[in-house]
Amino acid sequence: MSYRAVLWDLDGTLTDSQEGILRCTQYALKACGIEESDPQKLIRFIGPPLAYSFATFYQMQEPMVSFAVEKYRERYGTVGWKENRLYPGITDCLKALKAAGYQIAMATAKPEFYAKKIVAFFELMPYFDVVIGSSMEHSDASKAYLMQRAMQQLHIPETQKEQVVMIGDRKFDAEGAAACGLPFIRVHYRYAPVGELESYPSVYLADTVLDLKTFLLAHAAS
């Protein structure tokens, strides 16, 4: 199979955002009266929507969930979004994919405002045709919905969606790809819990960005 478009997840796939997410999560939990120092519990916040994470991992209910999200964003909006780094080789990968003729989009659960800010901060905007994220008001938008929006803005018809591949690191990415009928590439850098993605089909497992680039260039549509 050959591909002509790629949809990227952001946290844990394009960037290593652990520092910012963990610090902002601790800040929000402390505001809710919870002291959390276990990094393994905090790492669970990398990938899923915030409201889902607070409700699922700390059994919060409204209005506490909304308060926690507000406190998280309070710190994230000032310093947290910059506590972030590109995975080695990402810029070269995007540059090579663009040169090979790929359309490149992002579909992330992160609010679109911050997703675009991060892409611009790392000087990656020239490589992206579309950056799609959730809205501040509806941060629990499904990954499938975000992927559909990205494909619509890339003007990819339903009859050609098999030529679009989703790249991600968590089950939310795999579930979204399956719901949209898209092939899925799993990146195995560090954050997904052991066994989380074993039951989801994927066309490739990339241990490094170089692996990912090599596979995509070998399967670029002519």
Predicted features and spans:
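Acidic, Mg2+-coordinating phosphoryl-transfer loop and its flanking beta/alpha structural elements
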Residues: M166-Y204
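Substrate-recognition element of Asp-dependent hydrolases with the DxDx(T/V) motif
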Residues: T25, C93-V119
